[in-house]
Amino acid sequence: MKAETPSFEAHQFVRVRRGDAVRRLIQRDKTPLAVLLMAAVVGTLAGLVGVAFEKSVNWVQNQRIGALAQVADHWYLVWPLAFILSALLAMVGYFLVRRFAPEAGGSGIPEIEGALEELRPVRWWRVLPVKFIGGMGTLGAGMVLGREGPMVQLGGNIGRMVLDIFRMRSPEARHTLLATGAASGLSAAFNAPLAGILFIIEEMRPQFRYNLISIKAVFTGVIMSSIVFRIFNGEAAIIEVGKLSNAPVNTLWLYLVLGMLFGCFGPLFNFLVLRTQDIFQRIHGGNIKTWVLMGGVIGGICGLLGLMQPSAVGGGFNLIPIAAAGNFSVGLLLFIFIARVVTTLICFSSGAPGGIFAPMLALGTLLGTAFGMAAIPLFPAYHLDAGTFAIAGMGALLAASVRAPLTGIVLVLEMTDNYQLILPMIITCLGATLLAQFLGGKPLYSTILQRTLAKQEAEQAAKAQQAPRENT
């Protein structure tokens, strides 16, 4: 006797039942399994967006450089074209941010910190396209910005998007997926999973609600984003500096001196960032046309600088291995360092969609290498390697400015694959952090968040005062 085949209606009934079961599981906000499943989804999406963002920025840069190469033999064409192309790309980023999502300007990390405390909105339907396309414009223009800040904000917004799509209503899931997305975004930007975890625990420690569910979710998301990154980009170190020699014990005091140097520079750098932000605020006064034109001028100047001194612009990832290899003299290293300090301050403080992690890593490399090369003739018996000071300097400025020494240490070691330098890294970053704190320096991202919240309160107070007048 022939067995009866299930009818179409039976197939549909089973499919609906399965869909309802999955939906009920996910909507149990207190179920750790549901949070972990969503964390895996968030991490996977953050990894995919991170890879797409990196390749999109590289494509824009290659198209811009390729267009300039076509007219490289005609100086009267290449200089105006370099300015115009970079200016137009930058203006796209500035316009999108100012017109559609002001919170997408700058790094975006303070916005995620504010969102974790439920003090700042997360409008993912606006921020995701604006930050992605705007970042393509500003980074593609050659401005001195990094992609890590945008990736943290994109990742956090992906976390909130997933939460809204699956209608998970518990405050715990709301907070956890936002943090998971931020950690996954940093991991996808640098291929540094442990640094992504530490960044949430250390830098966002006042906002992050640490418990077993949240930390497992962060781990899950970071694992998935790292797997996605390595599928597309391979498992090699993101910054190729080669295997450097370990630092002998009798040279470790030099790394403490280097850390103290960064401990002095870190608070000064933060002060300059904030003052430069105030200057730009006075220049454009909130006017969108002035703001976009100003951004176009900055982008165009970066395009011209890229022709004269390519090492002075861009995120700095290409510069780091060249500088760490000792290919520049001490004088040239210091010149590029000063030039990049100026360009970093201008590009980041203007409110362009882009991060400051990568530019700070490049600054730390330049100053660390210069210190090491200056120390080599002073202490010939030590047989010093300037590259080890470059690696130590990379994390030291991050530690002094952002006040996240653990993140700085692990991030640099993961990016360069030089884990044998962990002891000099610890000494340098700890010295930088302690001295920066002693000098009264405040963490950069926390300070920017406080200023943003103060501005938000002032705007709300102004609206509250204006409302009664309109009603009368």
From Swiss-Prot:
Motif (Selectivity filter part_3): 355-359
Catalyzed reaction equations: 2 chloride(in) + H(+)(out) = 2 chloride(out) + H(+)(in)
Segments carrying motif Selectivity filter part_2: 146-150
Intramembrane stretches: 109-116, 177-189, 193-201, 387-401, 402-404, 405-416, 417-421
Keywords: Antiport, Cell inner membrane, Cell membrane, Chloride, Ion transport, Membrane, Transmembrane, Transmembrane helix, Transport
Keyword flag Ion transport: yes
GO molecular function, one term: antiporter activity
Location of the motif Selectivity filter part_1: 106-110
Major localization listed first in the record, in broad terms: membrane
GO cellular component: plasma membrane
Residue ranges annotated as Periplasmic topological domain: 70-76, 233-252, 310-329, 377-386
Site (Mediates proton transfer from the protein to the inner aqueous phase) residue list: E203
UniProt-annotated location(s): Cell inner membrane
Protein topology in the membrane: Multi-pass membrane protein
Residues the entry annotates as binding chloride: S107, I356, F357, Y445
Site features described as Mediates proton transfer from the outer aqueous phase to the interior of the protein, chain residue numbers: E148
Keyword S-adenosyl-L-methionine on entry: no
Side Cytoplasmic, residues: 1-32, 117-123, 167-176, 202-214, 282-287, 439-472
Similarity comment text for this entry: Belongs to the chloride channel (TC 2.A.49) family. ClcA subfamily.
Database matches in NCBIfam families: PRK05277.1 (NF003640)
Assembly, per entry: Homodimer.
Function text: Proton-coupled chloride transporter. Functions as antiport system and exchanges two chloride ions for 1 proton. Probably acts as an electrical shunt for an outwardly-directed proton pump that is linked to amino acid decarboxylation, as part of the extreme acid resistance (XAR) response.
HAMAP family on file: CLC_ClcA (MF_01128)
Protein name listed in UniProt: H(+)/Cl(-) exchange transporter ClcA
Gene: clcA
